[in-house]
Amino acid sequence: MKGEVSHGRKKYLKWYNKVGYGSGDLAGNVVYAFLSSFVMLYLTNTVGLNPGIIGTLIMVSKLFDGISDMFFGTMIDKTKSKLGKARPWMLYAYIGCAVTLVANFAIPDTLGTTAQYAWFFVAYTLLNAVFFTANNIAYASLVTFCTKNSRERVEMGSWRFIFAFSTSLLIQSVTVQFVRAAGGGAAAWRTVAVVYAVIGLIVNTISVFSIKELPEEELKAGKDHTEEKYGLVEAAKLLFSNKYYLMICATYICQQIYSAMLNMGIYYMIYILKNEDLYSVFSWAINIPVIIAMCITPMLVEKMKGLYRMNLAGYILGTAGRVGVIFAGYMGSVPLMLAFTAVAALGMAPWQGDMGAVVASCSEYTYLTKHKHIDGTMYSCTSFGTKIGGGIGVALCGWLLDASGFVKESAIQPESCLNMLHVMYLWIPMVLSLVITFIMSRMNVEDANEKLRKQLERKEKYEC
């Protein structure tokens, strides 16, 4: 992969490398968007399981995830193969993702209730703690292994999330109708899961072979070439000593709980707005502004002179949008809810496109302060935050539904349940976006790195 030099910056990637990389999140969201948006609905309204028990099982499952995130991140850093460090993990782990995705939506009705809970727990844990972890960390870390150009990293992130949100939009828009067209019931959900798994497997394979990792000597050019050896415990210490890593993890967790609450919108549409087809309309209001923002994120980074200002301004706008959704929701105005939902999504979108570049800066911060390369391990925050946050979010949804007196397979819900749906869909997302805005105000890792580089330069000049 030969680099070009343009405007004093070396370029490592062609346009099709960036697009090919981005398509990998189509495969990732075939798993994640489908699972997070519809598994609770499938389990409660089709299989007939208790949402509170489901939430508890999901929460217990997440106990395995923290260890597996750091484990696979460390394994990626230590991997040497013809495909590179990350691509082998991304390629082969997706086979397991496809199989276990289908298993989550293929719970046999011949099993007893306890066995059905056990089936779900095993399938869900294998998918999240093992296969999706390995695939997702490898995929995220490719941003570091394929280019050293910060603008290209932002562009890769933008393409990634264009595909992610396009896929999420499509799945949220067509799945209910797809299940209905497939005949409804358990068999229909299984058919839909098989179709999505096959599509994901094909696209993931294409993505892996559309991009190449830079040779190790190229990645280490200008840096200390000493062979670095560290175990899982030391890797964990390096991660948790980096305050920006902790901030990114917290942001990811809040984001995923936020997304889980919005994914429960299917219940809000069915029982509050009395029209389940509005779920796809709200998906468009969320995802179309995000896709538009992704296209202009690299330009916005240049215009606003850095990631920090853009991300903070975006989340201030996003929080204001969620406040508007609350007012519109209690007014009962669907058009206003859609408008403010779009404003919120537009404001939060730039972070989705540039977070890969921020994580790369976070990894650089560890190198500048600890003189250790932990690029693959650093990207565990993406998988860790996604799965822990998503797990907490789905579990919380199950617990809140159960506590509210939700009646399975009933067209009419008690007033306590309707009030809880307002809290889940309107209030909790606003509070979470406010928390993320505060974190963003503290996450100026670019400035911290610049100061550290200047300190090192002064030290080197003094020693000379």
Region roles according to the model:
Residues K2-C464:
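Membrane-embedded alpha-helical bundles of multi-pass transporters/translocases
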